[in-house]
Amino acid sequence: MGNLFGRKRRSRVTEQDKAVLQLKQQRDKLRQYQKRISLGLERERELARQLLKEGKKEKAMLLLKKKRYQEQLLDKTDNQISNLERMVQDIEFTQIEMKVIEGLKIGNECLNKMHQVMSIEEVERIIGETQDAVEYQRQIDEILAGSLTEEDEDAILEELNAITQEQLELPDVPSEPLPEEPPEATPVKNRPKPELVAAS
């Protein structure tokens, strides 16, 4: 139990992870700032309209200038958010590339070790030995096949014909099912034996 809950595993948070988190937090703050400015712009527009109705043109003009400045700030904020998002994407993609490169490095090391164990010369030697063994076996097969005389060939054919003939002469298997129990034997009645008559 102590091992299970006592010690926490170390979190493997990298510097890149921290940077991505900070960039995303900054982006979220900028979005909140944008929302606040957008709400303020709507209010100031309504207020400028009200001031114009009241005949306070200069105050309305001043308010619209402020509104215009805040709209420019919104545009700048959009650009900053785009830059932050691009930076986050670049960091995340670079992390993926680093993992791919690390995988390629490990794979390359593995291949090099395998090549050291099995060099081209070793492969060529094994293939050569295999071809030699196949050729040797082929020669043995040819010798064995060529060692049969004409009499042997005739004897083989004769045996083959005999086996074929045996199969042809076998009786057919009855198609009717066999009775389950054999019929009981009926006893033969005792006949009286004829008496022998002596010849006179």
Swiss-Prot record:
Lipid attachment points (N-myristoyl glycine): 2
A Pfam short name: Snf7
Gene Ontology biological-process annotations: late endosome to vacuole transport via multivesicular body sorting pathway; protein transport; vesicle budding from membrane
Subcellular location, principal: membrane
Record InterPro entries: Snf7_fam (IPR005024)
UniProt entry keywords in alphabetical sequence: Coiled coil, Endosome, Lipoprotein, Membrane, Myristate, Protein transport, Transport
Coiled-coil residue spans: 10-94
S-S bridge residues: none
GO cellular component: ESCRT III complex; late endosome membrane; multivesicular body
Region (Disordered): 169-200
Keyword Protein transport (UniProt): yes
Annotated localization: Endomembrane system; Late endosome membrane
Annotated motif Type-2 MIT-interacting motif, positions: 168-179
Membrane topology term: Lipid-anchor
Family: Belongs to the SNF7 family.
Entry function: Probable core component of the endosomal sorting required for transport complex III (ESCRT-III) which is involved in multivesicular bodies (MVBs) formation and sorting of endosomal cargo proteins into MVBs. MVBs contain intraluminal vesicles (ILVs) that are generated by invagination and scission from the limiting membrane of the endosome and mostly are delivered to lysosomes enabling degradation of membrane proteins, such as stimulated growth factor receptors, lysosomal enzymes and lipids.
Subunit (UniProt): Probable core component of the endosomal sorting required for transport complex III (ESCRT-III). ESCRT-III components are thought to multimerize to form a flat lattice on the perimeter membrane of the endosome.
Name of the protein this chain belongs to: Charged multivesicular body protein 6
Organism: Gallus gallus (Chicken)
Lineage, uppermost ranks: Eukaryota, Metazoa, Chordata, Craniata, Vertebrata
